[in-house]
C-alpha cells in the first residue's frame, strides 16, 4: 500500500514492480485508494445516514484485499497466505487493517516500513470529534455548511482548499478515524488488549527517517519508538516481530538513508532508478528481497540467508541492520 500522508500518492510509482518477487515465487499486487478529502473526510450526518464515515480510503483498501483473497488463486497465488505491506502512510494503513475485524481474517503476515498507526506522541488516528472539527474548518474554507453542498463543488476546488487546510493542520489533517466500524477503538487501547491480528510482523525504519524530535537520536522518537513499543506488545502475545534499520546512504545523494529510500531495495527495482547504483547496492537489494519474500512465504525472513534475523524479544533485543 503506497504512502503519501493520506493526501497523495499512487500505486504505479517506479519502485513498485513485482519482477524480483515473482522470481522468488511471490505475487505482488499494488493497489490504489481514495486519499485526501475524498478518502478521509468524516461527516457526522453522513455517518448517521450510512452507519459509517471518514474511512473511505481504508474501505477501498479492504475492498482490494477482498478481491485479492477471492481471485488470487486464478493467478497462481494462495488466498490463505496473504501479506499486507505498506510504507509510511501505507504502513499506517496496513497497521490499521491489522486491527480491523473487516480485514484481519484475510491477513496472514504484515510488513510495516517507516510507519505505524501509533508512531507519534499520540496515535495517528482521529476521534470522531477531532475529525469533525477538521471537517467543519474545511467546510468553512469551501464556503459550505454540509457535505451535500460540498459535493456540488468541482474536485479541483476541493483539492485547492485541502492545500489551504494543510497550512492549518500541518500534521496529516486527513487520517483514519476511530469509527467503530473499520477501527473499533484507538490503537493503543487495542494493543493493550491484544486486539491486533495474531500474525507475524516485520517492521522497521530508515536511519534518517522523518518526524524525529529536534536534537534527538532517531532511536528516541518517531517511527522507531513505535516499532519497539508495538514489538514489545506483540511479544506479550507470543507473536513474532522482526525489526530492521535501513542505514544505507543512497548513491548520488547527500540526504543519507532518507524516508522511502529503502523502497528501491525492498522491491529490487534498482534498474529503474536514475541514481548511480553500484554492485554493492545490487547485493543489498538482493539480500533485502530475499528476506522480504521469505517472510511473505512463511512468516520468517530467514530462508536462504547468510546471517540469522532473530525475532524481537524483551530479554534479547535484536534489530537487523541493512547497510
Task: Tell me what each language-model feature is.
Residues 1-144, 191-211, 234-236:
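Serine-hydrolase-like catalytic core of hydrolytic proteins
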Residues 21, 99-103, 252-258, 311-312:
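Short glycine-biased active-site loop of nucleotidyltransferases that positions the nucleotide triphosphate
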Residues 34-37, 85-89, 244-253, 307-314:
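Short, solvent-exposed turn/loop segments enriched in Gly/Ser/Thr/Pro and often Arg
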Residues 67, 292, 309-312:
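Signature tryptophan residues that serve as conserved aromatic anchors
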Residues 97, 288-299:
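Bilobed periplasmic-binding protein/Venus flytrap-like ligand-binding cleft at the lobe interface
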Residues 109, 117-124, 141, 145, ...:
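Substrate-gating cap/lid region and adjacent catalytic-acid/histidine neighborhood
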Residues 302-323:
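Mature extracytoplasmic/periplasmic domains
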Amino acid at each position: 500500500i503506497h504512502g503519501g500522508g493520506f493526501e497523495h500518492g499512487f500505486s504505479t510509482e517506479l519502485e513498485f514492480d513485482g519482477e524480483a518477487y515473482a522470481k522468488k515465487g511471490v505475487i505482488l499486487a499494488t493497489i490504489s485508494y481514495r486519499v485526501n478529502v475524498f478518502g478521509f473526510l468524516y461527516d457526522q450526518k453522513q455517518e448517521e445516514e450510512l452507519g459509517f464515515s471518514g474511512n473511505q480510503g481504508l474501505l477501498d483498501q479492504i475492498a482490494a484485499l477482498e478481491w485479492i483473497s477471492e481471485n488470487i488463486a486464478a493467478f497462481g497465488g494462495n488466498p490463505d497466505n496473504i501479506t499486507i505491506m505498506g510504507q509510511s502512510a501505507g504502513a499506517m494503513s496496513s497497521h490499521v487493517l491489522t486491527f480491523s475485524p473487516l480485514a484481519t481474517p484475510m491477513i496472514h503476515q504484515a510488513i510495516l516500513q517507516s510507519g505505524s498507526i501509533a508512531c507519534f506522541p499520540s496515535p495517528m488516528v482521529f476521534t470522531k470529534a477531532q475529525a469533525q472539527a477538521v471537517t467543519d474548518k474545511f467546510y468553512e474554507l469551501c464556503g459550505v455548511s454540509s457535505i451535500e453542498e460540498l459535493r456540488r463543488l468541482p474536485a479541483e476546488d476541493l483539492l485547492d482548499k485541502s492545500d489551504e487546510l494543510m497550512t492549518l493542520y500541518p500534521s496529516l489533517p486527513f487520517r483514519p478515524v476511530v469509527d467503530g466500524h473499520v477501527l473499533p477503538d484507538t490503537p493503543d487501547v487495542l494493543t493493550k488488549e491484544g486486539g491486533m491480528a495474531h500474525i507475524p510482523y516485520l517492521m522497521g525504519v530508515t536511519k534518517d527517517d522523518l518526524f524525529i524530535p529536534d536534537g534527538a537520536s532517531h532511536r528516541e522518537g518517531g517511527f522507531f519508538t513505535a516499532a519497539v513499543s508495538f514489538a514489545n506488545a506483540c511479544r506479550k502475545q507470543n507473536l513474532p516481530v522482526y525489526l530492521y534499520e535501513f542505514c544505507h546512504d543512497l548513491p548520488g545523494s547527500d540526504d543519507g538513508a532518507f524516508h522511502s529510500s529503502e523502497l528501491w531495495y525492498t522491491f529490487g527495482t534498482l534498474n529503474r532508478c536514475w541514481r548511480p547504483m553500484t554492485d554493492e547496492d545490487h547485493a543489498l537489494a538482493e539480500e533485502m528481497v530475499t528476506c522480504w519474500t521469505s517472510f511473505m512465504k512463511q512468516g520468517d525472513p530467514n530462508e536462504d540467508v547468510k546471517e540469522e534475523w532473530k525475532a524481537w524479544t524483551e530479554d534479547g533485543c535484536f534489530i537487523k541492520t541493512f547497510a
